[in-house]
């Protein structure tokens, strides 16, 4: 299985000298479903935006990001052909990023715009086969009956499912989801995560999802990458994450991750690692604690 996302020596410093990402090295295999966890401000969203080429890293270092072998950015410069690379990357935002006044189907078919002529994209004119593909994507996420409604009439969970359908219509080989369930109720959260897991499994689509709920990472993602103050402090099997380990990794900041009420009840310090859920053995053999130096 090849590498879908490769990140080497990525650093990001914001104005004022605040270091957001510290020397990130990360390889994600094609077809993996990986969780990014961390307290607020740990760098999860910043890292995802760099993966998508929406932000550029520091130019002074040797930072390099590639998706399926295509360069997204290098040495602080976004690749000149980034549009071609982005065509295979779906980004699911926390705030849905739909156009409220447009019908759901039109929002979903925005995923085809990179493949259609400019005049058709300006007129929002789609072929019957494109519309059929959009309706099928909406059926797969369970909201086909809403295709003619304005996006503004959907609930938060339905809007997030429409955003995933847009990535499916796009034909994305990689989906980057930035806290897609942060503002949703538990039932809507479950449906959204079930859909992401199904797309990962059925379409062999690589999924990287940032989460604030550790138990959700354990349930859906065999592998978890934990960030703390812009550094990777854990990269390994999700099932190995216990409250004790999280406190070791995060110290006082662990309260931000553990203070989730019922969300954390599935975490037990003596919970055995289920072999069928373990992250691939060749990678799991690596020491789970990354250097924070």
From Swiss-Prot:
Residues 5-254 form the ABC transporter domain. Keywords: ATP-binding, Cell inner membrane, Cell membrane, Membrane, Nucleotide-binding, Phosphonate transport, Translocase, Transport. It is an enzyme of class 7 (translocase). It is found in: Cell inner membrane. ATP binds at residues 38-45. Its EC number is 7.3.2.2. It catalyses: phosphonate(out) + ATP + H2O = phosphonate(in) + ADP + phosphate + H(+). InterPro entries: AAA+_ATPase, ABC_transporter-like_ATP-bd, ABC_transporter-like_CS, ABC_transpr_PhnC, MetN_ABC_transporter-like, P-loop_NTPase. It is a peripheral membrane protein. CDD domains: ABC_PhnC_transporter. SUPFAM superfamilies: P-loop containing nucleoside triphosphate hydrolases. Its main location: membrane. GO terms for cellular component: plasma membrane. GO terms for molecular function: ABC-type phosphonate transporter activity; ATP binding; ATP hydrolysis activity. Belongs to the ABC transporter superfamily. Phosphonates importer (TC 3.A.1.9.1) family. Part of the ABC transporter complex PhnCDE involved in phosphonates import. Responsible for energy coupling to the transport system. The complex is composed of two ATP-binding proteins (PhnC), two transmembrane proteins (PhnE) and a solute-binding protein (PhnD). PANTHER family: AMINO ACID IMPORT ATP-BINDING PROTEIN, PHOSPHONATES IMPORT ATP-BINDING PROTEIN PHNC. This is Phosphonates import ATP-binding protein PhnC 1. It comes from Albidiferax ferrireducens (strain ATCC BAA-621 / DSM 15236 / T118).
């Amino acid at each position: 299985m090849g590498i879908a996302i490769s990140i080497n020596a990525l650093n990001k410093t914001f104005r004022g000298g605040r270091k957001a990402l510290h020397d990130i090295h990360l390889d994600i295999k094609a077809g993996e479903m990986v969780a990014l966890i961390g307290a607020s401000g740990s760098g999860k969203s910043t890292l995802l935006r760099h993966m998508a080429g929406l932000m550029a890293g520091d130019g002074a270092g040797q930072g390099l990001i590639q998706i399926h072998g295509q360069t997204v950015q290098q040495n602080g410069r976004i690749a000149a052909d980034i549009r071609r690379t982005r065509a295979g990357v779906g980004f699911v935002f926390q705030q849905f990023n739909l156009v409220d006044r447009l019908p759901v189907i039109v929002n979903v078919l925005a995923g085809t715009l990179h493949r259609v002529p400019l005049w058709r994209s300006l007129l929002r004119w789609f072929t019957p086969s494109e519309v059929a593909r959009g309706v099928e994507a909406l059926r797969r996420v369970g909201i086909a009956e809403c295709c003619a409604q304005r996006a503004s009439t959907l609930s938060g969970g339905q809007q997030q499912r429409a955003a995933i359908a847009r990535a499916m219509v796009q034909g994305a080989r990689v989906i980057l989801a930035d806290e897609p369930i942060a503002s949703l109720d538990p039932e809507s959260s479950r449906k959204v995560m079930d859909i992401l897991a199904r797309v990962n499994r059925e379409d062999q689509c690589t999924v990287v999802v940032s989460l604030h709920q550790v138990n959700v990472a354990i349930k859906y993602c065999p592998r978890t990458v934990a960030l703390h103050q812009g550094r990777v402090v854990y990269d390994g099997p999700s099932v190995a994450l216990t409250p004790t380990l999280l406190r070791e990794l995060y110290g006082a900041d662990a309260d931000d991750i553990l203070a989730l009420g019922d969300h954390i009840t599935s975490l037990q310090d003596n919970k055995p690692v289920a072999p069928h859920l373990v992250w691939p053995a060749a990678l799991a053999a690596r020491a789970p604690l990354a250097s924070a130096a």
